[in-house]
Swiss-Prot record:
CDD domains on file: AdoMet_MTases
Gene: rsmA
Source lineage: Bacteria, Bacillati, Bacillota, Bacilli, Lactobacillales
Homology family: Belongs to the class I-like SAM-binding methyltransferase superfamily. rRNA adenine N(6)-methyltransferase family. RsmA subfamily.
Cross-referenced Pfam families: RrnaAD (PF00398)
Name of this protein: Ribosomal RNA small subunit methyltransferase A
Reaction(s) catalysed (UniProt annotation): adenosine(1518)/adenosine(1519) in 16S rRNA + 4 S-adenosyl-L-methionine = N(6)-dimethyladenosine(1518)/N(6)-dimethyladenosine(1519) in 16S rRNA + 4 S-adenosyl-L-homocysteine + 4 H(+)
Any one Gene Ontology cellular component term annotated for this protein: cytosol
Entry superkingdom: Bacteria
Function field: Specifically dimethylates two adjacent adenosines (A1518 and A1519) in the loop of a conserved hairpin near the 3'-end of 16S rRNA in the 30S particle. May play a critical role in biogenesis of 30S subunits.
Length: 294
């Protein structure tokens, strides 16, 4: 299938026609906003740097606007769609492609490891490329990142504010537990901004394409990974409070003397705030506080 004879569905007239014919109604609970801009879709595909030696997982394909572009560049695309009313639409729009697999399921509830074995060549690198539902962006991302599946790269659209938080540096307003949780595993950067005007229906905020590349090993080495995340999350519960106040709230007031002693030994100020600590400093903090683990 060449560029000249591809029946593009990524324009507002074709999209509206497809939705009208199938009597489709947008469902707010699924956060549905369909892209209708050829240039943006091309840019997303280019950012993903696909080839016929790469498989793709897509979440929330909608009517398949982005899916078309992915299928032309990747070996295979496996798309997960939770909205049953979109299944007949996708079966129609993706009919010309033999490298497309549609899974009618919630990405958070499927056995993803079993599903990816259904790729014709499951040993190829797998990238996640998707316009993620805004209402559940973070749970989906963390579910995929923390899974045992070695996704090599993510190129995903989300609210600009969330993308900024994930890619944020220490001592910035956007920096927080989400920044560290993702950057521990992935190198994250905002690739480009997507205006709200290129969707139907238009969302209330602008979006961003976030590119995340999996690190060969976590960014920092810690003695206890679960404890590292618990300590880190505890430090951000109340952003305006000091590290000591947050840690006391997490581990109990009676633990204050021991926390003070452990922080002093690690040369970490109890009056600093969580957003001022780098991921390396959080690793040092977590290891220092390990004696508090019950």
């Amino acid at each position: 299938m060449t560029e000249n004879n591809i029946d593009r569905i990524s324009n507002i007239i074709r999209t509206q026609d497809i939705l009208r014919r199938h009597d489709f109604n947008f469902k707010k609970k699924f956060g549905q906003n369909f892209l209708t801009d050829h240039n943006i879709l091309t840019k997303i595909t280019q950012t993903a740097e696909l080839s016929k030696e790469v498989n793709v997982i897509e979440i929330g394909p909608g009517i398949g606007s982005l899916t078309q572009y992915l299928l032309e560049e990747a070996a295979e695309v496996m798309a997960f769609e939770i909205d049953k009313s979109l299944i007949p639409i996708l079966e129609e729009t993706m009919a010309p492609y033999d490298n497309f697999t549609l899974v009618s399921a919630d990405i958070l509830k499927v056995d993803l490891l079993s599903e990816i074995q259904k790729f014709k060549n499951p040993n190829l690198p797998i990238k996640v490329v998707a316009n993620l539902p805004y209402y559940i962006t973070t749970p989906i991302l963390m579910h995929l990142i923390e899974s045992k599946i070695p996704f090599s790269e993510f190129v995903v659209m989300m609210q600009k504010e969330v993308a900024d938080r994930i890619a944020a540096s220490p001592k910035t307003k956007a920096y927080g537990s989400l920044s560290i949780a993702v950057q521990y595993y992935m190198e994250a950067s905002v690739a480009f901004i997507v205006p709200r005007t290129v969707f139907i229906p238009a969302p209330n905020v602008d979006s961003a394409i976030l590119k995340m590349v999996r690190r060969e090993a976590p960014l920092v080495e810690v003695e206890d990974e679960e404890w590292f995340f618990k300590t880190m999350h505890s430090s951000f519960v109340h952003r305006r409070k000091t590290l000591m106040n947050n840690l006391q709230a997490a581990f109990g007031k009676e633990s204050k003397p021991e926390i003070e002693k452990l922080l002093a030994q690690a040369e970490i100020s109890p009056t600093i705030r969580g957003e001022a600590l780098s991921i390396e400093e959080f690793a040092k903090l977590a290891d220092a506080l390990l004696p508090l683990k019950k």
